[in-house]
Amino acid sequence: MSIKPGSIVDNQILKQDLNAIYASGWFSGVKINSQNGPLGVRLIVNVIPNPILKKVELNSTNSIVSDQYVDDVFKNYYGTTLNLNEFQNKIETIKKRYESEGYSLARIKGPDRINENGIVTLNVTEGVVSDVQLRFLGTDGESSIDGEPRKGKTKDWVIKRELKTQPGSIFNRKILEADIRRLYATSLFDDVKVSLGPDSSNPGRVIIFLDLSEQRTGSLTGGLGYSNSSGIFASLGLQETNALGRAWSTNLNLNFGEYSTTYNLSLIHI
């Protein structure tokens, strides 16, 4: 406290001292009372210390972080008076654990409640995925035409089978990045962009939007030639790597000659 015996009592300074005591992190309640006496004002500071910390619990039902890990973080503080400043530093350690494993939407709030037995409960929201929505973009970068969603060539199930991020799973940045790499590996898309939005009907959950720019998957080739067996001939080749929007690869080659006509058709179903 900055107020000392012999100093003038100032309410503003008293308020600052009160806040400083709270800020030390050791107390759950602080109250300053005054008594008038023959030699001046006597200040009585009543404090309620925090309880002895015995256990820290996470309330999340989908917790990635184990109870054992939480105990390991706080074990040196179990059996000592709870200091909220030191406690917050340890919460940051748990947050970094979530982040390092890719759970970047995890949020830890608290302590919500400190009971008299020294058990602290932390409120954890880990960012559960409500839905994964696909939006196809045109060359203009828009996902709608006259207010209606733009339809893509590729079937939705072809895209979603590449995704390990599913409704009901906990959002994981590393898993989603791997999902995007698999989508690029299909050679069906020029660009894949990700955005996140809250689910208004399910607070604490998130909707993932994938904005997809499809690339051209068909090619047509042709030519003229001459051979002893066919004479003058014309060739035509048609290749499509996303037939019927199912990621099927088709290849058709036609050769028209003076003496013969040949063709070759292949279909690869992935």
Predicted features and spans:
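Periplasmic polypeptide-binding modules associated with outer-membrane biogenesis and secretion
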Residues: M1-I232, G237, N251-S266
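Conserved small/polar residues in nucleotide/adenosyl-binding loops
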Residues: I268-I270
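Short loop/turn motifs that connect adjacent beta-strands in outer-membrane beta-barrel proteins
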Residues: A243-S249
